[in-house]
């Protein structure tokens, strides 16, 4: 099947859109402390608390608006949602560059979270235009654009941040605006009117996907382990900038470069090491090794006082990236084929929850143990120490699941034949169809054909 030039251009647009969204998230990390302090004249620790609230607002908007925008795109099409979200992102970057008060920073983060929630629509667009046999490859390109954006974003933010904390946002605004113009001319609608369905608030509920697996203990427990691991992992983007400024006196450029190096090594571990580890060590061992590396890295970063030691533990932590894909693979292998979409929705909802909880918890810990008069000790690394304990809890939960549900040391594909659900004696291994709730109209996940309205 030959790919038309138009199809190539639309795919390029989608990849640029995902890339710019993540670049916008990464840009703010190195310059956020300086921008907050410029507006508030607060100390680094107080700026960290404010930064936590800003990230909390952003993550909350993404969590609640992702399913809403996804369902709106099912009703009105992908093109308008994507183009409007890019217009909103461009406006957000201009607001962040201009913001005369802290209130306007919050306005910008709210707008960014809402518009960034449309990235799920970008994935849906790729699914619309791609044959089933090529979807994994195309989704891999989206993942690559995501990873590249997180690497490039902190570098741009750090380097341009040397000219002032607002400088990176002007570049981001210009790039987003240029992509709007590009998309206006090259992006056709991918969802025909006959494949659309009515907007439904039940489908737009972000908690629905998690609740759907309450009767599948093995998946619920593994989701719990993944939730804890992801919660700990949020410490890096939320506290690393404030921690390195306070403890080592780093500037925006050093913060940006360190996050970029971490992102590169983390991506390498996920792209190259996961397959090797699961093939020769098994999935269970791979998860345990990855969690162990994460726990050691977090505890080490919290205790170390030299830059050499900091870089050493940062490198160790980057290789913990093998844990999440292996754990996600175990989750997928313990769900039925027609539950994979629901499962990934639950995983995304879980990750979004960690992005809401972690900013407040981590920055409050950092502030308390750095300059609060009631602190028992001065310990700027407290959030990383807490993250190490959380990873240890995730490991304990995973080991419990491995023993309880017999998650043996096997590569992913060897377990696909036996989804593990509790079954009454004499019943099939697969769970009944009623486990995953249907839409209110009883159509499940099937699209409703557009037709003239009729009344009974």
Where would I find each of the regions flagged by the language model?
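Conserved MFS/SLC helix-loop-helix module at the cytosolic interface between two early adjacent transmembrane helices
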Residues: 63-102
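Cytoplasmic helix-loop-helix junction between adjacent transmembrane helices
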Residues: 108-147
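Short amphipathic helix-loop junctions that connect adjacent transmembrane helices
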Residues: 30-48, 238-255
């Amino acid at each position: 099947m030959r790919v038309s030039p138009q199809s190539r251009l639309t795919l390029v647009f989608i990849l640029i859109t995902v890339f710019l969204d993540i670049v916008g998230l990464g840009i703010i990390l190195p310059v956020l402390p300086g921008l907050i302090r410029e507006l508030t004249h607060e100390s680094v620790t107080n700026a960290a608390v404010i930064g936590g609230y800003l990230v909390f607002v952003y993550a909350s908007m993404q969590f609640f608006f992702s399913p809403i925008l996804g369902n709106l795109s099912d009703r009105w099409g992908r093109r308008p949602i994507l183009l409007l979200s890019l217009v909103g992102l461009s406006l957000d970057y201009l607001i962040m560059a201009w913001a005369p008060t802290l209130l306007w920073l919050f306005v910008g983060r709210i707008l960014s979270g809402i518009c960034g929630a449309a990235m799920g629509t970008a994935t849906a667009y790729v699914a619309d235009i791609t044959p089933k046999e090529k979807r994994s490859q195309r989704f891999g390109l989206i993942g690559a654009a995501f990873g590249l954006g997180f690497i490039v974003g902190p570098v741009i933010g750090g380097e341009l941040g040397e000219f002032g904390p607002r400088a990176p946002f002007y570049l981001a605004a210009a790039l987003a605006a240029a992509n709007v113009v590009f998309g206006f001319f090259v992006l056709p609608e991918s969802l025909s009117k006959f494949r659309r369905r009515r907007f439904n608030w039940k489908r737009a509920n972000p908690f629905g996907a998690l609740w759907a697996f309450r009767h599948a203990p093995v998946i619920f427990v593994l989701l719990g382990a993944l939730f804890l691991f992801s919660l700990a992992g949020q410490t890096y983007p939320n506290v690393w900038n404030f921690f390195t400024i306070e403890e080592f006196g780093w500037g925006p450029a050093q913060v940006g470069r360190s996050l970029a190096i971490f992102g590169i090594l983390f991506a390498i571990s996920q792209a190259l090491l996961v397959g090797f580890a699961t093939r020769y060590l098994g999935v269970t061992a791979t998860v345990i090794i990855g969690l162990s590396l994460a726990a050691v890295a977090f505890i080490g970063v919290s205790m170390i006082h030299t830059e050499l030691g900091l870089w050493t533990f940062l490198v160790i932590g980057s290789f913990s990236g093998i844990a999440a894909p292996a754990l996600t693979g175990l989750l997928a292998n313990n769900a039925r084929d027609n539950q994979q979409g629901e499962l990934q929705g639950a995983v995304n909802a879980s990750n979004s929850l960690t992005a809401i909880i972690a900013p407040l918890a981590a920055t409050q810990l950092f502030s308390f143990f750095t300059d609060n008069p009631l602190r028992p000790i001065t310990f700027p690394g407290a959030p990383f120490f807490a993250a190490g304990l959380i990873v240890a809890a995730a490991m304990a939960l995973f080991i419990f699941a491995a023993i309880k549900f017999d998650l043996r040391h096997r590569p992913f594909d060897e377990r696909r034949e036996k989804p593990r659900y509790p079954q009454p004696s004499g019943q099939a291994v697969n769970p009944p169809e009623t486990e995953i709730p249907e839409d209110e109209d009883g159509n499940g996940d099937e699209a409703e054909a557009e037709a003239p309205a009729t009344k009974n």
